[in-house]
């Protein structure tokens, strides 16, 4: 009977669905595994990146389910966001209709691949029920001071007409549409992620050896903790008159280089710069250039060529009394430290580049034979008055102490991470549950009024926020004073939704109507045991999710410190050496692969072609090869004895049979390591292929039966449909359980030993594994007799199971 993928796969998908085979059990005393792949945006079709992500997760979920764990393996859709609005403009379709039509199609595609997702816990973040509890979290955070409003410069995308978080600006462009981003002053809501900066940094230690080092490093750098000195510099008298300011604050991590300061660099937004601008004390050319800098995103400023302009004013060095020129510079950010940087060109590369460009003084204060700039924190101070000849660290501590003693500075800790702006001027998002009242100011909605849902009678034009233009939706009554008021028309950044969906999945779906998170079930299921997704989410999603976990813990919703215990970042799927994309014309449609070869072939290829963390190059020939392997497995199984296993006696097997059985059990042993630790599915599949090849040389019915019993067990998480089909036919699926190794299979009948004389290999021989040490040494001498002739043996060394070494003279 020929292998018919479509019939087999549809049959088993129906059986699994009807029997709710993949739903988590209610028994919370069972050992648990929560396996989660990052949920998709419902763009309309799944791509090979999705297939890879979900195949890895599904293999792990199926494995743990099979060996007796209570497994939660959910799926949902990150369904708010700009693409739905863009589609509404392009195709004249409502964002909601576009989104839910896509969800319906993608669900069909995902389940056609045999993924063992829980259907009962499926959700979309645009569902009103999800919005209700998200708005509840927002209000609770607002009441605790974790969300606040402020007017600030924001990253503004002219194309999408919305605000972007710093993390969403890539090389000065919108991460979503690629349009140039400008700086714009706007009011908005901010999440106080900085309140958790220290904990977010400290808890990265808990994730070492469980998360990729690259992700940990990226988060550590993004949080950007720095300890240093914050101090005041007085302005000279003329500068005080010009700026209407008497002093400015500066932060430095290198107090030891304080005597090397040759200029102070200010952010364009600094109060002193703004005062000069407001009094028209800067010429038009400088004014125009400052405006250009102000329109750059923080990342652009950091990466572009260093530029600056002398402001014509001076500060007084707090220790030496020297006059220091003040410059405005594009590399200084207003919200890091005080928006002012003390520049030490001799010992900082950026400062050196700037000073060289503008011919500013370069004062060396650390002794070195190396070329400047010398940036090491090693060496003795010079040109630093009473601190000369101190090493850098000692000098740093003493200088800080002197500033504190004089009450002109203090030790401080700064973080590079900024609070998260979550206001978005778009329609298709979760409405921010706040009210603007002329009498009361900003007031939260009452919890009983949630969810605040979107009106459906809107015109999506791409110009501004449709909620602002709606004739009635904004109108409401202030819950505090009872007067007429207006709803907030901004919606939430979609990363707000994806920052807690994993906890919602962990909550018993029977409680979803009543509460955001069910305490009992989230305590049992959280944290996620294995999280799978792309490295591109290292800073954005993963950092926000970690913050949310801690914030919800402190609000009493959760108990764990971290949301994801282990993280796997899978590599991209490439074709012709490039990421698959429509513009490159190198997209492979998963539907076509399933139709031609079946879902199991797609899954097998995906897991066999490369280790999960590495990039995967699409190869049509390798897909054909995967299909041929499944056909071969299916054909071979037709001749396997059905029913209960016939007991095998190891001592009754011949050499070839023992070797084949060893290969089968080696594959089983490897499966434990692969599923629990390395995820190197390619090596596991190769081990199964090797075992089947060895088995083909044997004619032992009982051995073949045992081998298929084990191999179908190993491969079921990878190619589930065909393994269920064959296992039901042969063993009534009794092989789908935790299998044990048989130690006697690994005991070798003979040993292959090498013989070395004075460390040089001279011979090899085979001997019974039951031979005594004396017998082995005697056999070794016999095999090396010609090298021993006329010599005396000084020492005999036997390294058990490996070699004999004879020392002669």
Swiss-Prot record:
Residues given in the record as ATP binding sites: 582
One GO MF term: ATP binding
Span(s) of short sequence motif 'KMSKS' region: 579-583
Gene3D superfamilies: 3.10.20.590, HUPs, Isoleucyl-tRNA Synthetase, Domain 1
Family in the record: Belongs to the class-I aminoacyl-tRNA synthetase family.
Species name: Campylobacter jejuni subsp. jejuni serotype O:2 (strain ATCC 700819 / NCTC 11168)
Entry protein name: Leucine--tRNA ligase
GO cellular component: cytosol
PROSITE patterns: AA_TRNA_LIGASE_I
A Pfam entry, by short name: tRNA-synt_1_2
Motif 'HIGH' region, residue range(s) on this chain: 40-50
Biological process terms in GO annotation: leucyl-tRNA aminoacylation
Matches recorded under HAMAP family: Leu_tRNA_synth_B
Catalytic activity of the protein: tRNA(Leu) + L-leucine + ATP = L-leucyl-tRNA(Leu) + AMP + diphosphate
